[in-house]
Amino acid sequence: DGISLFLVVLTGILFPLVIVGIDPHHNETSYFAWMLLLQAGVMGSFLALDLFLFFVMFEIVLVPMYFLIGGWGYDQRVYAATKFFLYTMAGSAFMLVGIIATVSLAQRDLGVVTFDLVRIAEGASFSTNAARWLFVSFAIAFAVKVPLFPFHTWLPDAHTQAPTGGSVILAGVLLKMGTYGFLRFGVYLFPEAAMWARPVLFTLAVIGIIYGAIAATMQRDLKRLVAYSSVAHLGFIVLGTFALTSQAVTGAVIQMVSHGVSTGALFLLVGMIYERRHTREIAELRGIQHVAPIFAGVFTVVMLSSVGLPGLNGFVGEFLILIGSFGPARWWTVVATVGVVLAALYLLWAYQRVF
């Protein structure tokens, strides 16, 4: 449907590009096997309408990503892979409890044990308190996966230490499993609880937008800067998701795909720079446009799409989110617009010094 279609297409495009276009340099057979298992898990997560199947696919993704970071990453790869695994596993434990409780409570209304998402959403009724606790159990898992502030600390380390292909997939589709989960499962199963919790989620999203932008301006590693920019961009998606207006939700879905394209491309380009310069330190990367003018032009277009320049893919989703969120989340939206300005500042600052 409209929620998962574009994410499935994005997954189907990014994985072949990464597999064909990026050389893992060693243990190619194992690398490609983990990549294909990772693709199966991501596809399954976006296609599942069964709570148990979704949980299994959500967890399957952890294993290949752990080995991709730990086996083909950089100096601190084992630390980053372990941190990613433990954070996400801890969040998923809450979702497992929530799924078991949801199915158990739904059995009273449905008369049968079922994990079917549509059947539970349309046929089961939960008390106010039960719905709130169940929503929180799902929300914790998705907040870690997005990641929302303050669950974000695993992301910069994972991105910085992951191989280029791992970073492209992590930014392009893996993080969207969290935002997709909020929309597909959290809001759909527990709409009233989502309305109850959204002031907290608005606040965390906006903090993530501002914090991610400020943290990005302080980075000296180009890849880590792009990683923190993801924290800010995903804050916009969560803001739009819980505004629950047609414009904001449409913008959130569009922004999921746009972020996957633009930030995935940024990580790919940063990886190309590292392959040739063997450093990601911004201070050591001056003057690239003099030796690679076409590459500099491509980087400029991708960077401006990440900023949200009108006419490029990053603008539409961000604009719809801000317009659609202004009514239900006026002051949060005003603060979020500051993040748009900060995004332009840190990306242009980095571009000026690198190129």
Kindly give the residue locations of the regions a language model identified.
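Structural signature of hydrophobic alpha-helical transmembrane segments
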Residues: 2-11, 51-64, 131-144, 194-206, ...
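Hydrophobic residues within the alpha-helical transmembrane core of Major Facilitator Superfamily
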Residues: 16, 40, 90, 182, ...
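Membrane-interface helix-boundary motifs at transmembrane edges
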Residues: 21-30, 74-79, 156-158
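Hydrophobic alpha-helical transmembrane segments in multi-pass integral membrane proteins
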Residues: 2-42
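Juxtamembrane/interfacial segments at transmembrane-helix boundaries in multi-pass membrane proteins
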Residues: 93-152, 157, 182-200, 248, ...
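Residue-level recognition of membrane-helix boundary sites in multi-pass small-molecule transporters
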Residues: 4-6, 30, 51-54, 83, ...
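Predominantly late transmembrane helices and immediately cytosolic-facing juxtamembrane segments
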Residues: 149, 263-267, 333-355
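Alpha-helical multi-pass transmembrane bundles of energy-transducing inner-membrane proteins
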Residues: 33-37, 41-130, 215-228, 232-282
